[in-house]
Every structure is written in structure tokens, then in C-alpha cells.
Swiss-Prot record:
Source organism, top-level taxon: Bacteria
Protein family: Belongs to the bacterial ribosomal protein bL31 family. Type A subfamily.
Listed Pfam families: Ribosomal_L31
CC annotations in GO: ribonucleoprotein complex; ribosome
Cofactor note: Binds 1 zinc ion per subunit.
PROSITE patterns, sorted: RIBOSOMAL_L31
Residues reported to bind Zn(2+): C16, C18, C38, C41
Designated name of the protein: Large ribosomal subunit protein bL31
Gene3D superfamilies hit by this protein: Ribosomal protein L31
Cofactors demanded by this protein: Zn(2+)
Organism (species): Mycolicibacterium paratuberculosis (strain ATCC BAA-968 / K-10)
């Protein structure tokens, strides 16, 4: 391997939006990574279903297209 071409692989602290912190290793400078969700608060791991709205995107989508049921559109097109 060539010398001085690989980034340093150092201990890094990951800080989640829920307040959970854990240690890992990364090549990112600064020693700190901030994330919105982690395994402690992600709905897949916790079993809780909630909408994670990043910047109002879900609200903007619902405003534009309205709240629709998944099977309602298919049933209407089948009746025609």
C-alpha cells in the first residue's frame, strides 16, 4: 500500500436527535457526527409508526395531493 494516501480512521461520537450517543470509527474530520434518527428512535427498530417530517415535506405533499386511501383510487378506476 502507498504511504500517506489513506485518511485517518479515528474514534467518532455519533449524536442522534433523540439524545442518544454512541461511539464508532469514521474518517470524518472533527470526531462528531450528528444524525436525525438512530436505532433507538427509528420506527423500524422501535415498532412505533410515526412520520418523520424533514422540513415540512410530508405536509407539503398532503396539501398538494390530499390524504388519499391506498385502495380508493384503484376501486374508482375499476368501476369505470
Amino acid at each position: 500500500m502507498k504511504a500517506d494516501i489513506h485518511p485517518t480512521y479515528a474514534e467518532t461520537t455519533v449524536l442522534c436527535g433523540c439524545g442518544n450517543t454512541f461511539q464508532t470509527r469514521s474518517t470524518k474530520d472533527g470526531g462528531r457526527i450528528v444524525v436525525e434518527v438512530c436505532s433507538q428512535c427509528h420506527p423500524f427498530y422501535t415498532g412505533k409508526q410515526k412520520i418523520l417530517d424533514s422540513g415540512g415535506r410530508v405536509a407539503r405533499f398532503e396539501k398538494r395531493y390530499g390524504k388519499r386511501k391506498a385502495g380508493a383510487e384503484k376501486a374508482e378506476s375499476a368501476d369505470k
